[in-house]
């Protein structure tokens, strides 16, 4: 099994919301046998199945955090209280926060779970990332590689 699982969440049809799946695309261009890549699309709840049996997981999604577009926040779900929002127009069905809470209640958390949230500029129906989120995509790829190196060092220790 791969040392690290990276799960991208988001709709490719909603501008910057596509950041998760597009990160998976970018990483698949740099094929690495120690990274398992999962494009979860807009099914945030479906990520729970990829938590089982994995020790190190990163989830990447567009997150409206009130920051500048393209801002990247590494979120440790055990250190913050994820707020569950009632969003009647969410394309994710149940959102990422709900999926995290459900995994926690089902005791299906991986040993090491990180969430990378990227502030979107626009999640309107269009086909392209905004310039700030394009820049964030490149940074997020580097974050994943840094995390893989950390996981490999842990395995060697």
Question: Predicted segments — roles?
Answer:
Residues 1-118, 127-139, 145-157:
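N-terminal catalytic or cofactor-binding beta/alpha core of small enzyme domains
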Residues 120-122:
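Short, internal active-site loops enriched in acidic
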């Amino acid at each position: 099994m791969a040392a690290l699982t990276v799960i991208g969440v988001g709709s490719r049809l909603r501008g910057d919301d596509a950041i998760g799946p597009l990160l998976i695309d970018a990483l698949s261009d740099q094929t690495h046998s120690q990274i398992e890549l999962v494009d979860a699309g807009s099914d945030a709840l479906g990520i729970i199945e990829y938590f089982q049996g994995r020790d190190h997981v990163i989830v990447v999604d567009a997150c409206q955090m009130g920051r500048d577009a393209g801002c990247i926040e590494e979120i440790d779900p055990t250190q913050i209280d994820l707020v569950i929002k009632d969003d009647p127009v969410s394309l994710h069905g149940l959102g990422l926060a709900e999926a995290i809470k459900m995994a926690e209640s089902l005791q299906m958390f991986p040993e090491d779970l990180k969430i990378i949230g990227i502030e979107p500029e626009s999640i309107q129906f269009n086909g392209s990332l905004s310039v700030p989120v394009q820049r964030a995509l490149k940074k997020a790829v580097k974050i994943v590689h840094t995390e893989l190196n950390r996981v490999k060092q842990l395995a060697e220790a």
